[in-house]
């Protein structure tokens, strides 16, 4: 039955009983005398009894039964005032009550007339009996209504706080500031059901003030229970402590799990203490209703740890203010989880007072004293969404049975606590060790705990400096978009510096073993490696090299091997170390062993230099001789070329013709540099240059000198081809000139000086013969070579002087006195080379022009016309033939 209907039925029953009592009293009065006449007034108007003090009220009634009960009486727990009884006066001097019907009826004239008939005591007895029966019926009805109402209210509270599946009992209550009380907070009304606080606790309870405030404001208790404030939903269940303490289903996940035999008060106090002493990541609910609730409903017990949150699968609805907040992400990690402790007795002695933070559990006060409300914790950093309830990490060896979970777990050994951020929740387990619970967003720093984080293996990368003037892909990343699993990454990539110590110790012990890499190293490691690579590439043994150095046989080794040996030459310090080494040669590397064998030969590397000079001497002498011979041949070719001389004549005549009337006219000679300018002077058509004209003139002159001149076209065609071939052959005729143009006389002179310097080194090596006791054949062979080398160098020197003289002569032959102004002695050959390359290009162009003319003339003459052709075609053919004949004659 709904509470409103129950209240309405109770009030109706009270009113009905009151009316029955009035009717019985009226009937009794009227029965003793005559019936009341209808014209007589109901209320007496002519007689007013004298005033008299009202009789004392009955022990079970406080007011008139016709008065409805006050809905907001400050005293009494949901019990409306009982219907009062009206004491019938024995004398007519009773003062009437203006608000009751029974008193008005008793003061009718019938009452006054009762004394005349002698029925006063009988009427009073009937009235008192009827009123008592009516009051008993009303009290019984109201008690039934109250029981029904209380049961419905308890069911509604359970539905609101626990949820349909008692999931609300597993929520962690939130704390709020202590200066605010929620309107409509329900306090226990059945002290017998759960052993609540004592009278002293209730006197100091703020809910007394709440009831007086509700009574003052006129707020109905049941109406407020039907429509609770939204702020009441995060509160934990308050009146199911006794049953939940022994419940096998919900005992582990409710805050009353740790309560003693006195109900759920101890667990609530522990929950309140943990909330007050923990950082703000434990809960995010209001901190104002919690202190008053814990002080009024639950007797204080020593707090152990904040109870773990229930699994999300058991909750159908998560209130918005009962979230655990661990940071900006919903994924919460439980580094160490608290273990449930056994039930604390109600008379447990208080522990010592709490030290400064990290906050330990507060000391539990005695049961007969009201606990002080804990200070409000700092506000949480953020409140996660309603749909993401964080899952606390379970201990590794926690049993799954809820009956076993209610039993105390064995004490857990101390764990290594990870560095915690400020938002980590600190709890204490059975052994007193501190356990931390951190969020994912706190894994990026040390958390201010001062403990260094475990070092992981490094990741070597190149960091890029962020620039503010351009947009980068890294600007799109958010700090909360991805979170790392700190435990997994530390387990996988821990930098094991301690296990790495034994290998280093083994390495130190192994250092005592002889090793050429550490103790027997003589050469630079890089140099030794290069020498070893060269030795493997040459595929030569130490014995072969030693024999060749002792005998002076350069042909046995070759110039490449000798050049490699020169590169292997050690420094003076390395040479001294290798010479003075008297240990085991097998302990040395391959490079050190090879150099040690070479250095055992007296003046080994000076011998190598002498043998390398001897091996390269013949090649260098031949190169110098060929170069000087080419210079002499170039001078002879340039002087004796008839076609080149004719070309110069054609250029001179053409230039004088073009320079008539100027200071440049009537020239008798010109520098060969002018030949490079012929291709720059272009004709009126924009294609033909002055060099084209000169080439065509030379071709025509060559055709004129042919022995047999004939009028046949074929003969003239062959003559024209012969003249073009003669001009084109000038480039091949002056081939030595082009070779000489690639030389540098200063370089050739430097080669000759180098040979003379090497010859001096050979002489210095031969002077060491007196100091050497072995390898005499080397000195004998070197003496023979020295005599021959001196003769060859003298010849080369003579050829050099002769070639240089020829070059000067040819320069004066073409340039006259201006040859002394030439800075480079071989420049004349370079000018002729460049002109010959341009001449070859012009000859190819002239040959294409002649070929085009021949094709056009031949196609016109081979054209045949049939006899049936018309005359205009014949006349056109004759005209075209005449034009072709004129062209041929003009070209010839």
From Swiss-Prot:
- What ranges does the record list as Pro residues composition bias? 47-59, 339-383
Q: Where is the composition biased (Low complexity)?
A: 87-111, 268-286, 297-306, 321-330
Q: What coarse category fits the chief subcellular location reported for this protein? A: membrane
- Identify this protein by name: Formin-like protein 8
Bilayer-spanning residue ranges: 126-146
This protein's GO CC annotations: cytoskeleton; membrane
> Which SUPFAM superfamilies does the entry link to?
Formin homology 2 domain (FH2 domain) (SSF101447)
Provide the protein's localization: Membrane
Q: Name one Pfam family in it.
A: FH2
User: Ranges of Polar residues compositional bias?
Assistant: 424-436
The stretch of residues making up the signal peptide is 1-23
What organism is recorded for this protein?
Oryza sativa subsp. japonica (Rice)
Protein keywords: Membrane, Signal, Transmembrane, Transmembrane helix
Which segments constitute the FH2 domain?
A: 446-867
Q: Which family does it belong to?
A: Belongs to the formin-like family. Class-I subfamily.
Q: Where is this region: Disordered?
A: 43-119, 188-457
Bias (Basic and acidic residues): 210-230
GO terms classed as biological process: actin cytoskeleton organization; actin nucleation
List the GO molecular function terms: actin filament binding
Highest taxon in the source lineage: Eukaryota
Membrane topology note = Single-pass membrane protein
